[in-house]
Design a protein with these regions (language model features):
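PLP-dependent enzyme catalytic core of the Aspartate aminotransferase-like
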Residues: 115-174
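Short, solvent-exposed beta-strand edge segments and adjacent coil->beta transition regions
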Residues: 33, 98-102, 130-134
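Short, solvent-exposed loop/helix junctions and linker helices
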Residues: 39-43, 107, 141-144
Length: 174
């Protein structure tokens, strides 16, 4: 609450106006959290938020967290079984309480591998400079089978050296 008075609002909406319905020519922000509002929330936006909350409520947060831990554990197990011997190095903590829903792998050809996976196998991973690939599970909708298949495609991409056919040109999206 202390910051509410100090922060400037970059977009000045009429809902944040001190005397909202006076329609004054000069913006005079209200002094509380209402000063950050821009306008009326859209019905579609509100409905989307409501549906999202319902999904999380029905899935139960403990189940989501458990699936995130189990999913990243599966990824680390597949790394140990398949990818370590292919030159990958695990950068993510093995302790599930010290990681989120993704793991990070280092490889000298990470950029080309990530681009080859997208181009040839329709597997989307995040590339981070200078040489890391981040792989995530979204616990609400990814299955363990999808994780397995994705890692199998990574293994085949590297074993078959598909990534060598990829140029070094930059891509804004990883």
């Amino acid at each position: 609450k202390d910051l509410q008075e100090k922060l400037n609002v970059p977009i000045q909406g009429w809902f944040a106006q001190k005397n909202q319905f006076d329609m004054e020519p000069v913006f005079n922000r209200t002094k509380n959290i209402r000063g950050f509002q821009i306008s009326s929330p859209s019905l579609i936006g509100l409905r989307s938020v409501n549906v999202s909350c319902e999904i999380y409520r029905s899935a139960k947060m403990d189940n989501i967290i458990n699936k995130a831990h189990t999913g990243t554990k599966l990824m680390i197990d597949l790394y140990d079984q398949w990818l370590r011997e292919l030159g990958f190095k695990l950068m993510t903590p093995r302790d599930s309480l010290k990681r989120g829903c993704h793991i990070s792998l280092m490889h000298e050809h990470a950029k080309k591998i990530s681009r080859a996976l997208r181009k040839f196998d329709r597997v989307i991973v995040d590339y981070r400079t200078p040489n890391q690939i981040r792989i995530a599970i979204s616990p609400l909708y990814n299955t363990y089978n999808e994780v397995y298949k994705g890692f199998k495609k990574i293994k085949k991409c590297v074993e078959g050296e598909k990534y060598l056919d990829i140029g070094d040109e930059s891509s804004k999206v990883t």
